[in-house]
Regions:
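Surface segments flanking catalytic/ligand-binding clefts of nucleic-acid enzymes
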Residues: 7, 185-336
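Short gly/ser-rich loop at a beta-strand->alpha-helix junction or flexible surface loop bordering the NTP-binding
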Residues: 1-201, 334-336
Length: 336
């Protein structure tokens, strides 16, 4: 978890090299002033996939934190906002596919972002909403973390920033918003109260309140958030309790921590990221599953592109274990 404070420093500028007007060996351009080593670039497959949902199909190979510092240093007197600010604060998820947006007090006309240029806008901010960050021996101005979250939520709600989620079209923005708030709470230690204060006058209060109510500080990834929102619908249908980060102990030792669990039905849910594909991790997962089965728990594991089957799997297992639906679930927008 990142410790955030006004005046903090960032190492994101350490890999920036002056752009001499030609591409140096092993480097790629960030903008007209800076280059970064190619080894930091995002995988082509992910970049292409993300660009499909960008409003102008812009492809961003350079991670957001490097673009953020490069553009801020190249545009002195501006303020870094939204997803770019969150990337610089250390948010590890959801930030890399979007424009870097700078607020310029002298701007006459809004400018769109592109692969090598930031978006430029003109907005008013209160003095207490501005932080200073040291980078490469210089100070850059960045919006305070809660304000950055709210600015990102504005872009999500207006569908200017999107990524794939399992939800109906009218509920997609809500799911993405909860994912962003979850990540901000988990990795940046932001509170719902601070986000709510920053949201006044910027985002619809009722919508923001529903997002904050549905959020959690325990989700370790956006996909885990997505899994929780789906599982909550099933829990409501069956009148069951859903818990997060449930620990299992044996002989005084922690055996596993399930991402989610239905205690009454003894079902444990896991979202397994890419690191679970290596042999040693798979072996450990198998050992955990065998232990859970031995104590009459049913482990269910999900990975990339597998969450669409979660509802059906849960319903089958719950019925096998003697549970029946007690209510039809409200939609996610029922929180609105």
């Amino acid at each position: 978890m990142t410790h955030l404070y006004n005046g903090m420093s960032t190492t994101a500028g350490d890999l920036l090299y002056p752009n001499p007007g030609r591409l140096l060996p092993g480097m790629t351009s960030v903008n007209g002033e800076f280059q970064v080593p190619r080894h930091v670039l995002r995988p082509d497959s992910i970049v292409i996939c993300d660009s499909v949902r960008h409003p102008r199909r812009v492809r961003y190979q350079v991670p957001a934190k490097y673009r953020a510092v490069a553009h801020a240093l190249a545009h002195p007197g501006t303020t870094l906002t939204g997803f770019g600010a969150l990337a610089l604060y250390g948010l590890p998820h959801l930030v890399d596919a979007h424009d870097t947006v700078l607020i310029s007090p002298t701007l006459h006309a809004k400018k769109r972002g592109s692969t090598f240029e930031p978006a430029l806008v003109r907005k008013q901010l209160e003095p207490e909403e501005l932080w200073q960050m040291e980078c490469r021996g210089e100070l850059i101005t960045v919006v305070a973390p809660p304000v950055a979250v709210v600015q990102a939520l504005q872009l999500i709600r207006s569908r200017q920033c999107a990524w794939p989620v399992l939800a109906s079209e009218d509920e997609e923005a809500f799911v993405r918003a909860v994912q962003l708030v979850d990540a901000s709470r988990r990795f940046l230690a932001l509170t719902p109260e601070a986000i709510a204060v920053a949201g006044k006058g910027r985002v619809n209060n009722r919508w923001l309140a529903s997002v904050l109510k549905a959020s959690s500080a325990l989700a370790e990834s956006p996909k885990e958030t997505e899994m929780r929102l789906i599982a909550q619908e099933v829990a409501r249908q069956f009148g069951l309790k859903l818990e997060e980060q449930v620990e299992f102990w044996a002989n005084g030792k922690l055996v596993t921590r399930a991402d989610l669990a239905f205690p009454e039905a003894r079902i444990a849910l896991y979202y397994d990221g890419r690191h679970h594909d290596d042999a040693s991790t798979r072996l450990r997962d198998t050992s955990i599953d065998l232990y859970l089965t031995s104590i009459n728990w049913r482990p269910l594991r999900y990975g990339t592109n597998m969450l669409s089957g979660l509802v059906g799997h849960l319903e089958v297992v719950l019925r096998e274990r003697g549970f029946v639906k007690v209510d039809e679930p409200p939609s996610l927008s029922g929180w609105l």
